Amino acid sequence: ALAYALAPSLKGKIEAQTAAAEKRAAEMRAWLAERPSKPGEHRAFWCHSARGLGGDRDWDASIRFLKENGFNAVIPNLAWGGVAFYSSQVLPVAADVATKGDAFAQCRAACRKYGVKMHVWKVCWNMGSHTSKAFEDQMAAAGRTQVDAKGRALRRWLCPSHPANQQLEIDAMVELAKKGADGVHFDYIRYPGGESCFCAGCRARFEAALGHAVTNWPGAVYGAKATLKREWTRFRTGNISRVVETVATRVRREAPGVQVSAALFRNPASDPETVAQDWPAWCRAGWLDFACHMDYVESAAMFRSQVRTQMEAVGKKVKLYPGIGLSCWENDGTDGVRLAKQIEAVRELGLGGFTVFNFDRRAERVLPLLRTGVTRED
């Protein structure tokens, strides 16, 4: 009898909660539909999968969906430090290319069909989980993988100071540019952190750059008592910057019209020292055509503040298309509003576009909401 008496009350509570949720959803849709669009801006999505959205959406269906929802560029992750998802003369080819096909050719065909720009995303140094164990073993045996400050092997990370590794990254990017991409896009163009690399090769090459031996290794360059910290930072940033400069020079010479861009960390003051990514220098030198800082924060105010700092550090030679972290936010149903607010912040700062992470199932849900407002094609 008690259960029977409670049932109507519980039912009413559920109905009230459902009605309130539906009202909030309707208000959100109405708010999004009122947001103005901005024709002609660069609207891109990073896609971490080499196969598009996946499931029943191949590259053709994925790019069609992207275009239908107001975006005009895609940055597909088709290459890592030790594997390519396409026919390559530089990198080992992923096993699934034999069964699923050449991802570069598939994505490019879809992009040409629907009028979407294709900037191929290359993860540098990090060989990733799709790289064969045989290639990992080969790199480790040749002394081409990283070692951390405690002497532990980082088998999936290629050492950025090794000349052969630098050449591998350069050749892979140039090959992609010459295959017919609209652009080539650096990612992980940095060290994993300040704790690497301290392999024997790094020591020898650093000593050669200094002109004398370093006896306290790695203590002389790493840690609270490091006496050669400035020289070490210069050495590490030089290894990374050399690749960026060479790729920019060769792509502009060998594949004119193909753009060079990068996904970047977001702190101009600390990034050169911590991860050896001296992106302010790259931008001032004009090596990049556009830069996408990974400004993955939920707050629109914090996002705006970060982007403003980056604008000051970059100067006028390079376009900024800030990275917005849709897939990194709490999935609470309001991500469409949050994304729209950050897009509006980009516009308020006078920038010509933005880049969203990541093109996945969550994006499939959110993009149709944006299409009614901020990415509407008038």
Language-model segment annotations:
Residues 1-76:
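Mature N-terminal, pre-catalytic/accessory segment of carbohydrate-active enzymes
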Residues 40-43, 52, 120-179:
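Active-site-adjacent "subsite" loops/lids of carbohydrate-active enzymes
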Residues 43-54, 88-101, 152-170, 228-241, ...:
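The substrate-binding groove and active-site-proximal loops of carbohydrate-active enzymes
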Residues 63, 80-123, 235-254:
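Aromatic-lined substrate-binding rim segments of carbohydrate-active enzymes
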